[in-house]
Amino acid sequence: MKRRLDLSRKRLFLFDLDGVFYRGKERPVKIGGTRIVKKLRSHQKKLLLLTNNSTDSVKTVHSRLLALGIPIRNEEILTSGLLTAEYLSRKYGKVSYYLVGEPGLEAEMRRFGHERTVGEEADFVVIGLDRRLSYEKLDHAARLVRNGSKMVATHVSRLYMYKNGPALATGPIVKALEYATGERATVIGKPYPEMFRMALRRAGCTARDALMVGDQVETDIAGAARAGIDAVLVATGVDRSIRGTRALAMVSNVDDLVEYL
């Protein structure tokens, strides 16, 4: 990265997690993060972590980061599950929902008082990654949507990195339901702008104040650009080039950013 990059005027730093601070979830391997977090704190900068991961609760993510020695506060973690639950609460109040997802997403929905149902009526079908998805569950969700339930998806990423390489993410599930019902889901996570808007609102900052740091062009960099936010790519995850993107720069490791504050 060239020295002319100056991040000193940025007030809010947004970070992706997997591929930026660590790799993997069950046995995460730390990439970096401790130095940049401490530096941002010493400069009185704000930071938030934005992850499309909906399978883990905020509590689980927080415990993982602390175990890796990264001094993050619970309220600085914004998962797609948390923001989906918050979005529904802010716009509709407490809702009933049918879950296509895992316990981490259900935990965030419960925090906001939303009521899970397995019956024939639901205000919403809430969709996250579901690694135990069955035909029966998918068919039931589609039937609910055809009967008037609305769909909201945590994100629509195609793949995520798992133990043995790329695995199907939430996107294929969402697309299957959209195809089966002819309806479109509201999407919260990256690269859609809702996650970025909610982060800016929470921090009390404008898009110009913020910088997004991520490892994926398709979600982190493109999503930030769509929201009017500058971005930097880290070369420790999925992508290794910023050619053809609107990223300001690429760094070898997230902790390299301390040189540009």
State each model region's role.
Residues 53:
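Conserved phosphate/oxyanion-binding catalytic-loop motifs
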